[in-house]
């Protein structure tokens, strides 16, 4: 496997302080991780206070609450990762070992490389979108200030976020600390989201690999042979199902919180673009909206992918077995395998299953809330 294998996830975990080379996913830089969390918390709560100062201003209210929700989600994701880091590290290393063992066979290696290439497309898309949010929050205020300087000869300072800093940001000795603090808060939320969400993508694709390798085993082996082949297949199928179950258990809380808030985030961000006007926050909101859409889609795509690949085992078993030549006893055993495979592996978020229908529900619900906000505005 090439150098790009697990590269996005490894770098993302290292940025937020974890050491992905250890089976326990130990926190290598706790002070840096603490600074990121502190910047998030100190950045989020003033936004809530500022948003609630004038409830009649829906634009200010929705702008600030959309960012507050993302910051809260990133903080929650980090806390979950800290609580479950040993389980996450164990799952990562189990998949590494399974992939290394399977890569000795050329066609198995081809499957592993293809799935990890798909993961890189997903992970890099979200990573680049998240870095776009950071860049927009850092560059847009500067460009707007420079544009004002060109037109009027006066540099008008604007901050990455609109809220009450309790300091006069028009003064240079206050403006630059506020500016850096604001960008760091956005970067912290983005880095923590990248670490968690790209890791979910990698785990999803590499769990899917285990189901795809089972299909290759069905194609390569004579399933009408001895009981050892049936036993080996059932054992590998059990491992794949256990990996999917562990993935669901680890990310259950994260998925639940994400999708309970996601439709509110979408409708609030969309509401901003239904209003006319330009500010330093518009590029930030636009890139933020793109990142949220990619984030939600990647989770639903991953859940649907695992579900469909686990279901495909039943069809593969049925198609590869020569049923007329098989003894009745062995036929019944393989029928039990099919029956188990017809109950798909799923990613649960306590109240819902993460799949493509969930994404449609989020979009429809966000549209309904957007219509409600437009009604309040009128």
Curated annotation (Swiss-Prot):
Entry annotated with the keyword Cell membrane: yes
Entry-linked InterPro entries: 7tm6_olfct_rcpt (IPR004117)
Q: Which UniProt keywords apply?
A: Cell membrane, Membrane, Olfaction, Receptor, Sensory transduction, Transducer, Transmembrane, Transmembrane helix
| Parts of the chain on the Extracellular side | 52-129, 195-197, 271-285, 364-378
Provide the topology term for how it sits in the membrane: Multi-pass membrane protein
List GO molecular-function terms, semicolon-separated: ionotropic olfactory receptor activity; odorant binding; olfactory receptor activity
Q: Which residues lie on this side of the membrane: Cytoplasmic?
A: 1-30, 151-173, 219-249, 307-342
Annotated localization: Cell membrane
Predominant place of localization: membrane
What more is known? The atypical heteromeric and topological design of the odorant receptors appears to be an insect-specific solution for odor recognition, making the OR/Orco complex an attractive target for the development of highly selective insect repellents to disrupt olfactory-mediated host-seeking behaviors of insect disease vectors. Odor-evoked OR currents are independent of known G-protein-coupled second messenger pathways.
Assigned protein family: Belongs to the insect chemoreceptor superfamily. Heteromeric odorant receptor channel (TC 1.A.69) family. Or1a subfamily.
Function in brief: Odorant receptor which mediates acceptance or avoidance behavior, depending on its substrates. The odorant receptor repertoire encodes a large collection of odor stimuli that vary widely in identity, intensity, and duration. May form a complex with Orco to form odorant-sensing units, providing sensitive and prolonged odorant signaling and calcium permeability. Involved in the behavioral responses to hexanol, pentyl acetate, benzyl acetate, and 2-heptanone.
Q: What is this protein called?
A: Odorant receptor 45a
